Amino acid sequence: MSLPRYPGEGPRDLSKPLEQVRVLVDARTAGQRLDLALAAVLTWRSRSSIARMIEQGMVRLQGRVVPPSRKVRVGDTIEVDIPQDPVAQPNQDARFDVPILYEDECMIAVDKPPGMAVHPSGRHLHGTLIHELHRRYRRPDEPDYDVVQRLLHRIDMETSGVVAVGLDEQFHHQVRKQFEDRLVQKGYLAVVHGRPVDDEGVVDRGIVPDKASAVRLKLTTCEPGSGQSAVTNYRVVRSNDRFSLVELRPETGRTHQIRVHMAAIGCPLVGDKLYGADEQLFLQGIAGELDDAGRDALVLDRHALHSSSLTFFHPRKGRDVTIEAPLPHEFADLMA
């Protein structure tokens, strides 16, 4: 979160929640409605939320409470009292079946198991990570402790490992911006078929829809400079006669990026129904028609991709934080 500094004010202490903002109106926002002018500054809040703050007297223009429609002028001072988020106090009596890797008043990071969706959508309306977190943090009868969880990033349902979730609106905005600006270091581990030609390398290939596929959501690679740019760094950790354990660090965050890139270099992920040897396995799986031969070909009942680490700047701690998830036992079994 980057706010314009009011003349004469020192740098803000990021280790504390933001309690008040003062804005000096300049030529860029002059003539706008008050709510629109504030929306350009309080970017983590919706316009309707800002309008409510104005109507509740939490915003003052030149020291006076005015309606959201009031036009602002060059040199006006806007003062905003920022409502504080509820305090995160986990319900210790609630069942929580996901391993916790890190937790503080601003966030929680968990080791998501494979097969769990991160949020409700489509066919997955129950049993998601968000449902689990609601049991731990939501307290509708105690507004001061009723915390809304906000995902900082997402991983596929079949992918296991680190998922970070914000428990504070300001914190979520600050860290989410790091993801958008590609400042977060994301590490993955995958078990792939075979062994890459080079033990270490970079896959720099754009990603586009695979028009030759019967599966609408399937993607494929193209030459650099076309499609969505995508870059993945990889390093072979160890190999046996069938598989390789590969460490991956994507520089971009495209849909299915690691799976597409590993398939493109001839080493698809173990268990990958869509980007493995036969996409018919994906269609059979969707239809519930996957037979024993298909399951044997896949080796695993999910694709072998694991979100192993996440490093980002924690604005309240004032330092980088690294969160790690241990190697899944099924990966270790494949590499034994």
Which positions does each model-derived feature cover?
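RNA pseudouridine synthases
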Residues: 1-336
